[in-house]
């Protein structure tokens, strides 16, 4: 369902991005130096379609995002832009780097967005500077408590009937207990997902802020993963702590150049 939405919006709006932050505000330029903009070019069946996702830098050549962003029917080519604020402009701060390959957990399933996480390996290392920096992510024993307010940024749409934002927007959302997500998503898994959102429905991400980090206390705890149609509440984010050992292992493999070619499922 989400996949179809993503693809159909990509057909209509090649550059608009598959997601939207609603009820947020523009961030101070370069105050989120870990943010990555993913431009995803569909190569098959037609090469004229493209869409975008969010992501975040966790190593000089490593970006985390949502697996469903790169798992489309047909192959895709991914380019990451770091150091961006206004994505419609080629800012001097921007570093545009092609993605060499990526890896998803062996048990990733696009049906229900189970294990919706991907680690992208960049072709060249990013130059770390004041506009481009890594962010730490939560350890396997770290959890944020229900009620904690964390922030999520993206270049998605700013209204349901709106358009993509060219500047980076951010919204604060609360960690919820699992109940609203269990009710709405039959395959909600509390160990690997987190339930997030604004109960009043005034503030939200949509699916194409997909891949962006849910940041609590300067650390990434979640990855924007799924929602239902235009419903603003609740949203399911991938729980990073569950995947921490897997991420560390993949980073070691990146360093050793041992990864199989992408797309891969190891
Ligand atoms: C993927 O695309 C092919 C070719 O267009 C089509 O035959 C197939 O049904 C599609 N699969 C899914 C899951 O949409
Ligand atoms: C982003 O850049 C474009 C192109 O220069 C400009 O038209 C637009 O107003 C800018 N957006 C914002 C919010 O400053």
Q: Where does each model-flagged region fall?
A:
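Extracytoplasmic
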Residues: 31-33, 73-77, 94, 115-117, ...
